Amino acid sequence: MAATSSYTACTKFSMLGWIGGKRELRKRRAFFISAQQQAEVEESQQVNAQEEEQEKMKQQGKQKLPRPVEPQVNVKSKNMSREYGGQWLSSVTRHVRIYAAYIDPVTCEFDQTQMDKLTLILDPTNEFVWTSETCNKVYAYFQELVDHYEGAPLTEYTLRLIGSDIEHYIRKLLYDGEIKYNMNARVLNFSMGKPRILFNDGLPQNVQ
């Protein structure tokens, strides 16, 4: 699948700066323990580390799916309200376009008044070949980033941070062999590096 796809995530960003003003730093507390307690603590930490590693393995085995978003009907293109100056909040890179709006995936109607939603348009130039599984991986990662930046100001800078992280994630998928270049794309410029060919050292190569 090389067609462009999109995904919309609900946000809890702040449009008036950081919620509650500046975040207070947690107070640092010093404490002292005996040598016996130190050994018990180290043993407990090792057990906890093993349990965390096992839990990570279990989570990696499960395929992450993005949270479903209820589709809307009769969506009409609307600009931002006057109180926000009609500004265009977006982050556009080669493979990731993020808009602070709801975009109908069928009609492409653009409703900028729904600022509580971020719409991701993935690989608009069809440079890569995507499957539903790899698309869902990107969408799930996008949802994780949106949750991570909860409470952050809704600005282009925040959207660029999210878009940059997704670009790095797409590069990782390419290097891991989960996606590949679309050789039928309109332009082949291999923006994330030239394709790499892996040889099997156990088999002789035909060399003339």
Curated annotation (Swiss-Prot):
GO terms for cellular component: chloroplast thylakoid membrane. Residues 37-70 are annotated as: Disordered. The keyword Endoplasmic reticulum does not apply. Keywords: Chloroplast, Membrane, NAD, NADP, Plastid, Plastoquinone, Quinone, Thylakoid, Transit peptide, Translocase, Transport. It is a peripheral membrane protein. It holds the Pfam family NdhM. Belongs to the NDH complex subunit M family. NDH shuttles electrons from NAD(P)H:plastoquinone, via FMN and iron-sulfur (Fe-S) centers, to quinones in the photosynthetic chain and possibly in a chloroplast respiratory chain. The immediate electron acceptor for the enzyme in this species is believed to be plastoquinone. Couples the redox reaction to proton translocation, and thus conserves the redox energy in a proton gradient. Part of the chloroplast NDH complex, composed of a mixture of chloroplast and nucleus encoded subunits. Component of the NDH subcomplex A, at least composed of ndhH, ndhI, ndhJ, ndhK, ndhL, ndhM, ndhN and ndhO. This is NAD(P)H-quinone oxidoreductase subunit M, chloroplastic.
